[in-house]
Amino acid sequence: MVLPKRLHLLLSGIIVILAGMVYGGYPEVWMPLVLDFRVESLELSNMLRAVMGIYMGIGVFWIIGSYKTHFWRAATLSNVLFMGGISFGRIISTLFDGVSVCFTPALILEILFFLWGFYNLKFNKNL
């Protein structure tokens, strides 16, 4: 089965934008529901909204890269680095802190997107 070369950017871009919206869009509402902790300080709200901005910015770049051939390689490389880095962090957390029921599915998806992007970089040099 051959997957389209650009689909990984489109899918991961949409997922990361949605994750960013969960982190930063009304963190005082979403964080207790999703992650079981309260956001009670201005600093924590600011940090979560900054994370939202990073996620939304990189997600938009990946979506642009999925449509614009000129940006495909840079977007795919940034996707591989992001997914590889976040996977590495979650693996370290799993080893030191234990298995997270909430984030294990995210870890699996991040590893899959990392491998898919790496594969695309290796075998699609003509883009």
Where are these regions (language model features)?
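Cytosolic juxtamembrane helix and N-cap/initiation of the first transmembrane helix
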Residues: 1-16
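Hydrophobic transmembrane helix segments
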Residues: 15-46, 52
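Alpha-helical transmembrane segments of multipass membrane proteins
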Residues: 20-21, 62-63, 88-92, 115
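Non-cytosolic membrane-interface motifs at loop->transmembrane helix junctions
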Residues: 38-39, 99-109
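Core segments of alpha-helical transmembrane spans in multipass integral membrane proteins
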Residues: 43-64, 81-85
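Juxtamembrane helix-break-helix junctions at the cytosolic face
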Residues: 60-74
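Membrane-helix boundary connector in multi-pass membrane proteins
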Residues: 80, 88-104, 122-123
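Membrane-water interface at the C-terminal end of transmembrane alpha helices
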Residues: 112-127
